[in-house]
């Protein structure tokens, strides 16, 4: 019997363009490099998600580029009202995740629980980013998620976990709660081992390249595409 494997999605965070207004051309550029999905950074200078006309434009641009909106990434320190409005884009734009960055655990727990209550009727999952300093090491984040009075998962940041120690161990630690990822383009990560661990724990969601715009976007996307191609080969080998 031949095992069929669903095609893995790869996406790009619009952090690549965060210091600009997000435009049709930006999304077209991401799609032109072969990516299927995007994560939008909820920065009002980047995307004014309070403005229904801007949300409507975003919906149209995504459709034109044939991109899915995987999720919205809410930066740390974002006001609750802005977090809510970023989430409410899901009333018009189908999306899977709202990625949040936790501060102090007690306050973060209240905010995540509040957002989870708003997100559930919209079919959106809350993912706590593992790069949050207060949630390191990985075991601390797992404890945080498991003690919430609401459902939430983990957005696993590979670069941050690598800096923190044993990456494979961290992947295994968060495995039961892993629902999305952030992936670097440049790193010293042992990808064969990391991706084997990802396959082992059963994660089938997208790999989202989360890259700051320190160089030309086109060059960065070309590099991300090469990393994607390497990932695809390694994932096939580890099946």
What are these regions (language model features)?
Residues 121-142, 153:
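Conserved anion-binding
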Residues 106-108, 134-137, 162:
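Short, well-ordered, mixed-charge alpha-helical segments that flank or form enzyme active sites
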Residues 109, 118, 145-146:
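S-adenosylmethionine/decaboxylated-SAM
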Residues 73, 101, 131, 160, ...:
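Histidine-centered active-site/metal-ligand motif
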Residues 58, 115, 224-226:
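Short, aromatic/basic amphipathic alpha-helical patches
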Residues 2-11, 16-36, 84, 89-94, ...:
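Histidine-acidic metal/acid-base catalytic patches
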Residues 28, 35-112, 121-125, 187, ...:
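Structural motif corresponding to the early beta-alpha repeats
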Residues 12, 71, 126-130, 156-157:
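Short catalytic-loop micro-motif centered on adjacent basic/acidic residues
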């Amino acid at each position: 019997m031949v095992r069929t494997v669903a095609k893995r999605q790869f996406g790009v965070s619009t952090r690549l363009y965060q210091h600009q207004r997000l435009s049709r051309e930006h999304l077209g550029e991401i799609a032109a490099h072969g990516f299927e999905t995007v994560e939008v950074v909820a920065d009002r200078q980047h995307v004014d998600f309070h403005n229904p006309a801007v949300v409507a434009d975003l919906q149209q641009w995504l459709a034109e580029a044939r991109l899915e909106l995987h999720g919205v990434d809410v930066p740390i320190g974002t006001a609750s009202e802005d977090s809510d409005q970023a989430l409410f884009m899901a009333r018009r734009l189908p999306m899977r995740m709202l990625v949040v960055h936790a501060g102090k655990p007690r306050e973060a727990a209240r905010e995540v629980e509040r957002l989870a209550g708003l997100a559930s009727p919209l079919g959106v999952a809350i993912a706590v980013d593992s790069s949050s300093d207060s949630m390191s090491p990985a075991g601390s984040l797992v404890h945080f998620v498991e003690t919430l009075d609401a459902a939430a998962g983990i957005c696993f940041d590979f670069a941050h976990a690598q800096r923190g120690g044993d990456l494979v161990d961290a992947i295994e630690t968060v495995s039961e709660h892993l629902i999305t990822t952030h992936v670097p383009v440049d790193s010293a990560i042992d990808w064969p081992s990391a991706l084997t661990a990802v396959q082992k724990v059963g994660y089938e969601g997208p790999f989202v390249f989360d890259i700051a715009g320190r160089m030309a976007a086109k060059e960065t996307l070309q590099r991300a595409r090469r990393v994607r191609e390497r990932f695809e080969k390694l994932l096939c080998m580890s099946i």
